[in-house]
């Protein structure tokens, strides 16, 4: 076997240097997530306007559901855009 196996080409695991970011929802309580609080909701939305995944934000299942519902309500009320700012 001359070449390396395909398992060696994986991305390196996050170590002490590249740990997870602090969860934005940890600073606020679950019941406080409201569709009118646009500044808080923007923490959970990507630059393209998509709702960030739980594994990125670090929130629980229940918190993710509340965040998703609040973002959708804010979009319906025209407080948040459906799409990001574009290119």
Curated annotation (Swiss-Prot):
Residues 1-23 are annotated as: Disordered. The keyword Nucleotide-binding does not apply. It comes from the Bacteria. Coiled coil: none annotated. The keyword rRNA-binding applies. PROSITE patterns: RIBOSOMAL_S18. Keywords: Ribonucleoprotein, Ribosomal protein, RNA-binding, rRNA-binding. One of its GO terms (cellular component) is cytosolic small ribosomal subunit. Pfam families: Ribosomal_S18. Residues 1-10 have a biased composition (Basic and acidic residues). Gene3D superfamilies: Ribosomal protein S18. One of its GO terms (biological process) is translation. GO terms for molecular function: small ribosomal subunit rRNA binding; structural constituent of ribosome. InterPro entries: Ribosomal_bS18, Ribosomal_bS18_CS, Ribosomal_bS18_sf. Part of the 30S ribosomal subunit. Forms a tight heterodimer with protein bS6. Binds as a heterodimer with protein bS6 to the central domain of the 16S rRNA, where it helps stabilize the platform of the 30S subunit. NCBIfam families: S18. HAMAP family: Ribosomal_bS18 (MF_00270). Belongs to the bacterial ribosomal protein bS18 family. This is Small ribosomal subunit protein bS18.
């Amino acid at each position: 076997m001359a070449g390396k196996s395909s398992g060696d080409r994986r991305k390196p695991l996050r170590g002490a240097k590249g740990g997870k970011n602090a969860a934005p929802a940890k600073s606020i309580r679950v019941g406080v997530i409201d569709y009118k609080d646009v500044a808080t909701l923007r923490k959970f939305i990507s630059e393209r306007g998509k709702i960030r995944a739980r594994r990125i934000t670090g929130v629980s299942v229940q918190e993710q559901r509340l965040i998703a519902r609040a973002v959708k309500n804010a979009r319906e009320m025209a407080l948040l855009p459906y799409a990001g700012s574009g290119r």
